[in-house]
Amino acid sequence: AVTNLSNVLKNGNDNFTARMFTEVVKNNPGKSIVLSAFSVLPPLAQLALASDGETHEELLKAIGFPDDDAIRTEFASKSRDLRSIKGVELKMANKVYVHDGGKLDENFAVVSRDVFNSDVQNIDFSKNTVAAKSINDWVEENTNNRIKDLVNPDSLSSATAAVLVNAIYFKGAWSSKFDERLTSDRDFYVSKDKTIKVPMMYKRGDYKYGESAVLNAQLIEIPYKGDQSSLIVVLPKDKDGITQLQEALKDPKTLETAQQSMYSTEVDLYLPKFKIETETNLKDVLSNMNVNKIFNNDAQITRLLKGESLSVSEAIQKAFIEINEEGAEAAAANAFAVVFMSAVVSQPLVFKANHPFVFFLKGDGVTLFNGVFHP
């Protein structure tokens, strides 16, 4: 039964990631984006445990969990697994800020701490500048100073009851690095016939590689030290195939299937160096994903604060990713047969990411971040 459960979180995250990705792409057409759907799950799961009635049902459905027990088991074990991933730095930090007069429900406080490793702090929201600074300093500290100014002081007031904050930070070195001397400015097709110059890294090496007819794309997996996390790049076969690819990825099974047909082979890999930051208004995005009730005045969030029923006033995500020769820093089937001719030297496959593509950063089998590179 244990394995079934961990599939609950994995499948819940895959579905949630696909849906959130679709919404964020819709809001940022033709742009580079990065998001961490995975880091939105803990606060939603916390709210599920603190809510009743339709609000509770809606949250369980959104994160793909059958019941509260599954949440308690899953998140406790997953946060342990992720904390022990080898070779990379991965930090997940959750915190609940509660208005000054409010007292946290004892059960909720225990679950927050034990299951989500989440701190709780009382704060005077009416002193909005001080409160915002306090929250933002905490976020900055927990994301290696990458995510700044998450909360706008104007969004806080004496009417604010609670603010849920989640931060995720990843830094990993490639198992084998790119040689900086081989990085050079090369053409990148921003559209079918318009190019710009981008710094393009190059490496010949053994990588897991695949092609997918359903996605009409090439895939490559670039491992980080410790081999428990990797970057998967999904490159459309057509230079202007990004929209079609995003459409195909709406079904989370397509990536899963494509990954299953990947195999190790020698590849000439060309990959741009890049840095992306995205701010996402989760209130808008979640509303489009059928999570509405927590934001309404009649939200049934009754088990977070003693004797008070709350609604969520604000939900924001800022995510960041940087990919370079050293590795990554992030704060958010069709088999292909190669026939060898005797006495002919085999040519490595070429994976040339010189037009917009989608990427997935995975740790311990779970997508932690994903996004689009579209300069």
Curated annotation (Swiss-Prot):
Task: Supply any other comment.
Answer: The N-terminal section (1-336) is identical to the N-terminal section of the silk moth antitrypsin I (17-352).
Q: Where is this site: Reactive bond?
A: 340-341
UniProt-listed SUPFAM superfamilies: Serpins
Q: Does the keyword Secreted apply?
A: yes
Domain of life where this protein originates:
Eukaryota
Keyword Lipid biosynthesis recorded: no
* Protein name from the UniProt record: Antichymotrypsin-2
Q: Which GO terms describe its molecular function?
A: serine-type endopeptidase inhibitor activity
Sorted alphabetically, the keyword list is: Protease inhibitor, Secreted, Serine protease inhibitor
Q: Where does this protein come from, organism-wise?
A: Bombyx mori (Silk moth)
Tissues showing expression: Hemolymph.
